[in-house]
Amino acid sequence: MNSANPSYIYLVDDDASFRSSLNGAFISLGYQVKTFSSADEFLAHPDIAWPAMLISDMRMPGKSGVELQKKLIDETLGIPIVFISGESTLEEAVQGLKQGAIDFIQKPFNMEDLLQTIEASIEKQRQNLAKKYKSIVKEERLARLAPRERDVCMLMVKGFSNPKMADDLQLSIETIKQYKQNVFGKLGIEDLAGLIAFMHD
């Protein structure tokens, strides 16, 4: 686990010894862990750091695991959930999975299986976060362009020649050339191949 890019596990279970055992195991593997004795205690937590995984018991005093899941859905907090339980019914397990749980694991369980599930989910989150960040950076760079410069940029990517762009945009060829220079300069891109790669990324 890369400590420079930590992953977070939120553990909700009313069994103190079970929480302590899993907490120690996860910390030893480099995860940042926060534990909670009930669904309500978790819901009172101010925020969630990402990438993250919620591991929850199904049956607890107060809100059940499924009720906690429903509350998170209602609040559009899409944290991936793995349910771990030794007493749940098949109906509860099916309901949790239908509501989007990553997995349902019965006690006793194989720790390696749980870790594989967690890491697969967190890796997927990392990839999604990287794509989202790249998209934000791209939009910030494109926002540097004036409207006409963006028009020229789009036509460049489509392979339009200078005369064709000038005709379509009702501009002079010299103006088109200037806009093209502006596009490369403002986006920090050296050539057309780089621009095409940037726009299609």
Each language-model region and where it sits:
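C-terminal output helix
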Residues: 89, 105, 109-118
